[in-house]
Amino acid sequence: MTVEEVRGSLDLTDNGAIRNSIRNCLTVFQNDPYLQGAIRYNILTERIDIVKPLWWEKPTATLNDTDFNYLMLYLEDKYGLTSEKKIEKAISIVADCNKYHPIRDYLNSLKWDGTERIRYALTRYLGAEDSEYTYECLRLFMLGAIRRVFKPGCKFEVMLCLVGGQGAGKSTFFRLLAVKDEWFSDDLKRIDDDNVYRKMQGHWIIEMSEMIATANAKSIEDIKSFISRAKETYKVPYETHPADRLRQCVFGGSSNTLDFLPLDRSGNRRFLPIMVHAENAKVHILEDEAASRAYIDLMWAEAMFFYHNFPVRLTLSKEMNKELKVLQKQFMPEDTKAGLIQSFLDNYNGTQVCSKLIYAEALNHPFDEPKQWEIREINEIMNNSIEGWTAFSNPRIFAKYGRQRGWERAASGNEPAATGSILPDGFRELTEEEARQMELPF
């Protein structure tokens, strides 16, 4: 429709003037030859965008006060519509009727050529080891990013962590992986910031640089909790009530420090560390930025193929989780206490131990009674960091330490663990008959 045709379709007052109504404003936005299709609601940023070029310069697509003033001037000049509130409401309605998600649109536009690239990307650009672990971690991260876009708020609790020297290209890799610079952010420095949602809003991949490496014991638990969160409850300035904002982003970590992970014997399962070596990279990621971006487009096309054609599990495989647990030890501070206990057990003649025995003999506290937190720490070390020993749940009698739960040396080959026999370290396991006589439950 031409401007004249649109003007002729507007409702009039009894006096024949164009009515200043929301309906008339809406008709203009939906049919004017310049404004038709120009105003859309961006689901990613939760803001209104102007998505086609108009007659003034705009640095970004997001509708701002200046844009609104230009639109008011145009409606006043061409249609005699002057009610600011009604124009504002009409903009809100027309935008809501034309929602779009730029990342979904981008991902849905991609076509994979059948060549694997995710498997080799970190080796190609950052010199990471070419391994199944490297491949699975990057693929998981990309599939999590896709799922978060198509199903905001879905459960995704892992952070891909790139570890290596300064200037290796870690941050650049995350930035280019986000496709557009406005979909990437490295501005999240504190997770207790009142404006944390606003710093995440509109971004797809958020880099947390060195945050984990500088965290203390309390803040690392806060970081774990933060990564696991599926939403933020937040009130933007122009709203009356807080609302749940489902997450559409994923988090990447980068560190120049090798032992960046906290000492956590129960496992840092949320953090997927990958060591990078810039000197081993086949191509520097900024050597030909256009070529790197084209390569990354095809990585996302590959990830979308997997997303649509195979069941998506946003966790590592069981085998890879075992490898992760071993690998993570390289990125944690040395566990000196676990080392002392392992050395003691490797030279220990007995086949069964309890936490009190470990405290007294391995940690050299023969005359002290362990505190509860020390018992918990020993249990954590024995259950997570010690090799060659397995826990037993039925309490057994220890000569010096009474009736205790503990651990027994893992049997070698098909040799069964000894039961009911006198052991060289001064204790023996009770038989069921002896336990019944002593009224000890098994």
Report each predicted region and the residues it spans.
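A short helix-turn-beta junction within AAA+ P-loop NTPase domains corresponding to the substrate/partner-engaging
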Residues: 263-281
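P-loop NTPase catalytic core of nucleic-acid-dependent motor ATPases
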Residues: 91-201, 205, 356, 363
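Short helix-coil junctions and helix-kink-helix linkers
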Residues: 361-369
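Conserved AAA+/SF3 P-loop NTPase catalytic/coupling segment centered on the Walker-B
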Residues: 205-227, 261-267
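Conserved catalytic/switch belt of AAA+ P-loop NTPases
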Residues: 220-243
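N-terminal nucleic-acid engagement/recognition segments and initiation subdomains in replication
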Residues: 1-116, 132, 136, 368-369, ...
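AAA+/SF3 P-loop NTPase mechanochemical coupling elements
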Residues: 196-201, 236-254
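Conserved alpha/beta core segments of nucleic-acid transaction machinery
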Residues: 306-350
